[in-house]
Amino acid sequence: MKRTLLPFYAVALLALGSTAAFAQVDVTVTGSTAFRSVTIDRAWSIFDVSNRSAQTNSASTGLITFSGTMSNAAPSLGGTVVKLRLSFSGSARGMEDVRNSTLINVAALPGEAAPGVSNTTRIPDLALSDVFPSSATPPIPESAFNRSVLGVIPFVYVKNNALTGVTNLTQSQANLLMIASGTGGMPSSFLGGNNSNPIYMTGRDAESGTRISVEKCIGFVGSPLLWTTNGAGNFVVTNGLTSGGLERDIIKAKADAIGYLGVADANAIAASASLVPFNGIPFSHTNVVIGQYSIWGYEHLVNKVGLSATKVTVRDALKAAITAPFFQASNTLYNVAFTAVAEMHVERGSDGGTITSLDF
């Protein structure tokens, strides 16, 4: 049998090529828009300061790809180049895309797309979600994912400041508001307001964890009647808005608007809108921690079983950066809008589920 011997330099080149094929880790994160700012900040923080770059195709939606090394946050990766791609689509949609290996748009790094094209596609590896997998439509079995809890995310009802007299929502009122607002519908006086003009309920689309969480927490079942505005600024029926930013803009602009938001979005329009207590309890982190305020859920991180070891390393570095007690307690990106897991004295086992004590 004739054997062909390769020169030493050829063997070396082949070995180098084999190493290069595994010389980078490419991880794509999708899901919750409510947790977007925290994820962007923490993702950037786990890269080595001296070796990191960002391709930002949309700062407002978080369509960003980071690239660099993570030798401090993930020592086992050493000098391996890591590409961490962020593309937020909503909690339920994000989990579905991870489970179904659906291609999503991500920001392309130089050389990854045709000239003049700014985005490329990837199958997402991780999804952030404001809700348990079982709350997706259709429900996703717990066995489909590795899942961990990153934080506690409260939601609040917010009204335009012109809706004077609306100082509380009971559970029954919140449910009625979901189906009876708008033209010819519920007047603000029904909620304690000072006039007979109709009140307009705005909200998120069906893929939104914010919507799912709020509906579960108030016990609403069915299809809500939601409103947005058209180009002329007039109210029109909608299936729901794709982001909290769009919803808060409606509440800010329209004197007869009310809706539900994450705390960060509510704070962004504090000059024009105010929080509405639920069942007589105003939102505060303390009221969440002790179980008095009930409109809240968990922020989850999920991935399909079988994620590669190097991607698990990146996942764990991101998770550690987000759940670090010092970060959750002291960083305003987190502690203004979210409640620290370590501070909770209560828990719940499902979205909108019974709140039980962790202390006794």
Language-model-derived ranges and their functions:
Residues 1-9:
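Bacterial N-terminal signal peptides that target proteins for export
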Residues 16-23:
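Sec/Tat signal peptide C-region and signal peptidase I cleavage site
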Residues 23-360:
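Flexible loop/hinge segments at secondary-structure junctions
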